[in-house]
């Protein structure tokens, strides 16, 4: 993931693969076709010139506060995945029905449809198993979205700032005699809008924080 101020481009062996302008989220580039076995030169070009009018954001471009970062913020990673892999795993809890809906994106880059087995295990963080299920799946070539609703049982533990109970879900994919997995943590909570406050699980939340300029990155 890359994070500088304006634009970054990625090249493999001198050929541009793509360009992105995101800052608040990781910038990911898919290099599967270019990274064949052997030696390659990977180049990242960071362009911090002012690309857009920034008059209203001058605190982010002058030497008095944030100034020019002149580089890359965050981790730089090159990661290898199986041809059939879990690209994304998201959890959407529902405290009223005591369930969590899992949104799973599976990539199949084998060039043809394939069958597999998806296993989902939910544990209390550092504790007992809440749910364990497996499903046979058929994957078309490319991106596949799988939606699964899982019961969390009768005695769910709710998350809030004072009792931040967490659960961990692990998704395991077996396809073409290869395995891939992804883990995330989540809390059982409901965020709603009250009359004058944001509410978590029906209770008002009093937000507090600090603004520290000129200390990032």
Question: Which residues fall in each region the model found?
Answer:
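Secreted/periplasmic carbohydrate-active enzymes, especially glycoside hydrolases
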Residues: 1-217
């Amino acid at each position: 993931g890359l994070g500088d101020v304006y634009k970054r481009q990625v090249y493999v062996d001198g050929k541009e693969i793509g360009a992105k302008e995101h800052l608040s989220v990781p910038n990911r580039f898919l290099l599967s076709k270019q990274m064949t076995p052997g030696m390659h030169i990977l180049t990242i070009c960071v362009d911090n010139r002012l690309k857009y009018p920034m008059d209203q954001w001058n605190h982010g471009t002058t030497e008095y506060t944030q100034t020019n970062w002149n580089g890359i913020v965050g981790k730089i990673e090159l990661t290898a995945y199986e041809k059939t892999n879990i690209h994304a795993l998201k959890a959407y809890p529902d405290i009223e029905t005591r369930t969590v809906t899992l949104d799973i994106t599976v990539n199949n880059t084998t060039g043809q449809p394939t069958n597999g087995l998806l296993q989902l295990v939910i544990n209390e963080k550092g504790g007992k198993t809440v749910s364990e299920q497996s499903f046979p799946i058929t994957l078309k070539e490319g991106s596949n979205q799988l939606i699964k609703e899982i019961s969390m049982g009768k005695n769910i533990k709710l998350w809030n700032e004072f009792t931040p109970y967490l659960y961990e879900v692990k998704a395991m994919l077996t396809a073409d005699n290869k395995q891939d997995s992804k883990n995330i943590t989540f809390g059982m909570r409901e965020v709603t809008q009250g009359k004058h406050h944001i509410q978590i699980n029906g209770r008002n939340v009093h937000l507090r924080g600090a603004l520290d300029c000129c200390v990032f990155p």
